[in-house]
């Protein structure tokens, strides 16, 4: 920590720092790191750019993100524990990098996103436990 007050407002610079710091930690994490590594290998920069666009769209309403998160996550071997770890790392990173309204908004949106993804992937506490569709 450099002694400067943590930012309370979200900016593109803060988003870039958050994404880069957070996903640096994700890459090193023994639980969720291997899932990302299997999907991305060493080619992280395009993914980080997409995530910067995603968080800019979510928090600043920039409209830069043009993806389909549910479809991207569907083939991954995700379980509730992966989302819990993702949220834990994200909250810790956010708390180190910003405060006040910025901190609240990032953490709130992360929880909503995690919940939405889990529902769409039919995992977690709100899973409907629907029968699997037969292969077409």
Spans of model-derived segments:
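Core of compact, soluble alpha-helical bundle domains
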Residues: 1-136
């Amino acid at each position: 920590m450099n002694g400067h007050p943590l930012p309370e407002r979200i900016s593109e610079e803060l988003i870039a720092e958050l994404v880069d710091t957070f996903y640096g930690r994700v890459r090193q994490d023994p639980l969720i790191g291997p899932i990302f590594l299997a999907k991305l290998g060493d080619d992280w920069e395009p993914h980080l750019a997409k995530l910067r666009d995603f968080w800019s769209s979510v928090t600043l309403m920039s409209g830069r993100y043009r993806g389909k998160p549910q479809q991207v996550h569907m083939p991954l071997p995700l379980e509730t524990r992966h989302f819990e770890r993702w949220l834990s790392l994200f909250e810790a990173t956010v708390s180190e990098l910003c405060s006040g309204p910025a901190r609240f908004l990032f953490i709130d949106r992360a929880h909503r996103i995690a919940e939405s993804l889990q529902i769409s992937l039919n995992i977690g506490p709100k899973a409907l436990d629907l029968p699997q569709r037969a292969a077409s």
